[in-house]
Amino acid sequence: MERIKNFTSSKMDHCVHMFVNQLNTLRSSRASPSILDTILIDYLGQKIQLKKLSNIIVENVNTLRITLFDPKIKNNVEKAIISSKLDLIPIFINNYFQIKIPVLTEERRLQLIKLAKKMAENSRICIRNIRRLSNEKIKLFLKDKIISSDKERRLQHEVQDITNSYMEKINVILSKKEKDLLK
């Protein structure tokens, strides 16, 4: 029965991890290399993440520096950054791109918060689906007489406790991101 709890926790952990990764792609007013995670570059006939083709560092609070491993892809990188919906403009200086992160408008901040809330709700749905799967497995064990009805209720209660803790994690992470976006 520990297997069910471990299954539930590991799958819910994955949902939270995916949520955090999604939130990291939302840009705030501060420069962060993770805002470029979704940018894909045409390289040798494949779409490859920019971070795998370059070194991305934070130059200062509102500036990123992108140093390409292969300078021949300069035009592809520039095109990909401009065509992304991040409102970023790359400037090529010497052998690197410099990207100034513009200050977010109040309207854009509210849009990003709304998007973050939608991502949080999708993560909550993921967690509830995992809870449902775990409860179905528990009911199957009861049906096959592997566990008693008392054990079934106890396991379902434990699965619910695990679910509640992961829902709280989602809420805490969302709250931190909202505060970050409102700065």
Curated annotation (Swiss-Prot):
<dbReference type="Pfam" id="PF01765">
    <property type="entry name" value="RRF"/>
</dbReference>
<keyword id="KW-0648">Protein biosynthesis</keyword>
<protein>
    <recommendedName>
        <fullName>Ribosome-recycling factor</fullName>
    </recommendedName>
</protein>
<keyword id="KW-0963">Cytoplasm</keyword>
<dbReference type="InterPro" id="IPR036191">
    <property type="entry name" value="RRF_sf"/>
</dbReference>
<dbReference type="InterPro" id="IPR023584">
    <property type="entry name" value="Ribosome_recyc_fac_dom"/>
</dbReference>
<comment type="similarity">
    <text>Belongs to the RRF family.</text>
</comment>
<comment type="function">
    <text>Responsible for the release of ribosomes from messenger RNA at the termination of protein biosynthesis. May increase the efficiency of translation by recycling ribosomes from one round of translation to another.</text>
</comment>
<dbReference type="GO" id="GO:0043023">
    <property type="term" value="F:ribosomal large subunit binding"/>
</dbReference>
<dbReference type="GO" id="GO:0002184">
    <property type="term" value="P:cytoplasmic translational termination"/>
</dbReference>
<dbReference type="InterPro" id="IPR002661">
    <property type="entry name" value="Ribosome_recyc_fac"/>
</dbReference>
<dbReference type="GO" id="GO:0005829">
    <property type="term" value="C:cytosol"/>
</dbReference>
